[in-house]
Swiss-Prot record:
It comes from Mus musculus. Residues 290-349 form the SH3 domain. It is found in: Cytoplasm; Membrane; Early endosome; Presynapse. The modification Phosphoserine is found at residue 262. InterPro entries: AH/BAR_dom_sf, BAR_dom, Endophilin_A_SH3, Endophilin_SH3RF, SH3-like_dom_sf, SH3_domain. GO terms for molecular function: identical protein binding; lipid binding. The modification Phosphotyrosine is found at residue 299. This is Endophilin-A1. Residues 1-125 are annotated as: Binds and tubulates liposomes.
């Protein structure tokens, strides 16, 4: 910064201190300007909080959101494609129902019913994914653009206006000690900045129907989601009711006990050593060289997403990096991946 620039900054700071501490009166902006400034400030705060709350509404599990964010960050660092989406609760429920439905098999009522409801839950999770994408594209992204572009630009104009206002008030206070032309130029710059800031705020507030359109897109996306959800649930309800009707119309089977086993006593001494019992000691795990950062698994960890490292309780994992306060990156059996910190105990810490 030039000497003249430093001098101007010093003058502005002097004027600001004299207003805050000394009670000096600065140039007042008109009420219309102040009201527009207030509305723009409220709009800015509303946009930020509504974006945050919308994401929490669509993805209510904070741990899953944090994990998803970490996975996407790691994928970006490694130059990989975007990681998996948010794990919908419907998808997790569907997975459990389908799994146990297969295990029970088709020769009972509960197993096939679990399969039908599990498939419906899977369809619901896909519809929920579509809702997430629709809301992001037509509601969250436009609000983010409004915040990053228009609102940020207005804040820049207001900051510049405040700087020029301080410069003008400082020179006005020194009227008679500085050339009139210098004071006139300061006033012109102040008026110019006020016009630009006023115009940008006016245009934003005048075009707020765009935000109404974005709200409409949010509501329409939810309406479409609930329509599809109702259709899926109605279809599975019909199938379940039909299954109940068929089961009720069939005669109930009676339990038929099988013949009891008879016990035959053998004569003579038993030839089985130790009465047929044997005991095998469990081998101890081989020793591990503790010459590099490593940790011991406290619990089993089953990877749920690409890039995670699975292990069993007692495994010794070589540490390569700490991703954040919740995740490590390490290697086990030649495989590399990341895992939660609270699943392990440190044996040799990573160097700081």
């Amino acid at each position: 910064m030039s000497v003249a620039g430093l001098k101007k900054q010093f003058h502005k700071a002097t004027q600001k201190v004299s207003e805050k501490v000394g009670g000096a009166e600065g140039t007042k902006l008109d009420d219309d300007f102040k009201e527009m400034e207030r509305k723009v400030d409220v709009t800015s705060r509303a946009v930020m909080e509504i974006m945050t709350k919308t994401i929490e509404y669509l993805q209510p599990n904070p741990a899953s959101r944090a994990k998803l964010s970490m996975i996407n960050t790691m994928s970006k660092i490694r130059g990989q494609e975007k990681g998996p989406g948010y794990p919908q609760a419907e998808a997790l429920l569907a997975e459990a129902m389908l799994k146990f439905g297969r295990e029970l098999g088709d020769d009972c009522n509960f197993g096939p019913a679990l399969g039908e409801v599990g498939e419906a839950m899977r369809e619901l999770s896909e519809v929920k994914d579509s809702l997430d994408m629709e809301v992001k594209q037509n509601f969250i992204d436009p609000l983010q653009n409004l915040h990053d572009k228009d609102l940020r630009e207005i804040q820049h104009h207001l900051k510049k206006l405040e700087g020029r206002r301080l410069d003008f008030d400082y020179k006005k206070k020194r009227q008679g000690k500085i050339p009139d032309e210098e004071l006139r130029q300061a006033l012109e710059k102040f008026d110019e900045s006020k016009e630009i800031a006023e115009s940008s705020m006016f245009n934003l507030l005048e075009m707020d129907i765009e935000q109404v359109s974005q709200l409409s897109a949010l509501v329409q996306a939810q309406l479409e989601y609930h329509k599809q959800a109702v259709q899926i649930l109605q279809q599975v309800t019909v199938r379940l009711e039909e299954r109940i009707r068929q089961a009720s119309s069939q005669p109930r089977r009676e339990y038929q006990p099988k013949p009891r086993m008879s016990l035959e006593f053998a004569t003579g001494d038993s030839t089985q050593p130790n009465g047929g019992l044997s005991h095998t000691g469990t081998p101890k795990p081989p020793g591990v060289q503790m010459d590099q950062p490593c940790c011991r698994a406290l619990y089993d960890f089953e990877p749920e997403n690409e890039g995670e490292l699975g292990f069993k309780e007692g495994d010794i994992i070589t540490l390569t990096n700490q991703i954040d306060e919740n995740w490590y990156e390490g290697m086990l059996h030649g495989q590399s991946g990341f895992f939660p910190i609270n699943y392990v105990e440190i044996l040799v810490a990573l160097p700081h």
